[in-house]
Regions:
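Conserved pre-motif I regulatory segment
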Residues: 40-89
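Motif I (Walker A/P-loop) of helicase-class P-loop NTPases
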Residues: 97-107, 227-232
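Conserved SF1/SF2 helicase motif Ia
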Residues: 106-145, 239-242
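Conserved strand-helix element at the start of the C-terminal RecA-like helicase core
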Residues: 132-146, 247, 315-323
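Conserved helix-turn-beta segment of the N-terminal RecA-like "Helicase ATP-binding" lobe
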Residues: 142-165, 260-268
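Conserved motor-coupling elements within RecA-like helicase/translocase cores
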Residues: 169-186
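SF2 helicase catalytic motif II
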Residues: 191-194, 200-240, 245
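Conserved interdomain linker/interface between the two RecA-like ATPase lobes of SF2 helicase motors
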Residues: 234, 244-261, 266-323
């Protein structure tokens, strides 16, 4: 035990624990200031989709980003366009978001092939289609990143859609606007969705809904928030019987149970049909060891981990995604 200036005992590593709390607080503050403003498309399309197959436009957009669609992504797009629902099971960082997102994008390009040019933001918002896609995320911190990822292709492909989020962090003026007209795509949490469903005019707001995506389904399943999500989905299916539902997950054991829980039961009290699409994308494994620069003391009681805590925090912050 060590003594501080006041003579009280202090446990080893307490200073590092303080550093950890400060680092967490700094990350939370950074997330608050990095919220992306919910504005519609502000520039014209960079990819001309006139007289072209939607899949060709989407592949060109992927190529413009330096990517190539994985087979499992195209399998999901085909299933969605066929009216199917299901569960996407793929490792973190393999493209589950665009696997679920490009289906409704291609559907719009197929049904409404003429892109609309960019214009005044207010006029574009007024001309945007009503709510078509509902994206449920378990964490408010993911809403801003998800919103940015969804907005990127619709801007480049010329879709007249709006993408906004509605969470506990949403500004009051945005909430007020959404109470009159929801965006074409809404990113929200189970709690915010449950409140949204209590509005008197909710059935009218959701009358054009085509798709619900439940992100990180493993985080919600078998929890109170998961039950909350299931109840919300059941309510939406009463209004929209043909509603398509897709779940995204990277870590699930029993995929059949996860899919059946997500899709619920139909009027016949049997499980709704749905696909399970696996993203078997090979990923390389690289192991880096964090070793103290100096070894003047080498405690065997586990305190070496606390000594390396700042290095671990730095490694986590440098990574794009961390588990």
């Amino acid at each position: 035990m060590a003594d501080d200036k006041g003579g009280r005992s202090r446990r080893p590593g307490s200073a590092l624990a303080v550093d950890l709390r400060r680092a967490r607080r700094a990350r939370r503050d950074a997330q608050k200031v990095s919220v992306i403003p919910p504005v519609p498309v502000t520039h014209g399309p960079t990819i001309d989709c006139a007289d072209r197959e939607p899949i060709a436009c989407v592949r060109e957009w992927f190529a413009s980003e330096g990517w190539k669609p994985f087979p499992f992504q195209e399998e999901v797009w085909t299933a969605y366009l066929s009216g199917e629902s299901g569960l996407i099971h793929a490792a973190t960082g393999t493209g589950k978001t665009y696997a679920a997102w490009m289906g409704p994008v291609m559907e719009w390009l197929r049904d409404y092939p003429a892109p609309r040019p960019a214009g005044d933001q207010l006029r574009r918002r007024a001309a945007a289609p009503p709510l078509r896609v509902l994206w449920i995320t378990p964490l408010r911190a993911l809403a801003a990143d998800t919103e940015a990822a969804l907005r990127a292709p619709i801007e480049d492909l010329g879709l007249p859609w709006t993408v906004e989020s509605r969470t506990g962090d949403t500004e009051p003026k945005v909430r007020a606007r959404q109470s009159k007209r929801l965006p074409t795509t809404l990113v929200t949490t189970p709690e915010s969705l449950s409140l949204l469903l209590t509005w008197t005019d909710t059935p009218a707001l959701f009358e054009h809904l085509e798709l619900v995506v439940v992100d990180e389904w493993h985080e919600l399943m078998s929890s109170k928030r998961g039950v909350q999500t299931e109840l919300a989905l059941a309510r939406l299916r009463q209004w929209r019987p043909q509603l398509r539902t897709w779940g995204l997950s990277a870590t699930l054991g029993n995929l059949d149970t996860a899919r059946d829980t997500l899709l619920g039961v139909g009027p016949d009290r049997h499980s709704r049909p749905g696909r399970i699409i696996r993203g078997l994308v090979p990923k390389g494994l690289q192991i880096d060891s964090l070793i103290p620069e100096t070894m003047e003391r080498f405690p065997w009681s586990g305190q070496i981990g606390l000594r390396l805590l700042p290095e671990v925090i730095q490694a986590i912050e440098e990574g794009k995604t961390s588990l």
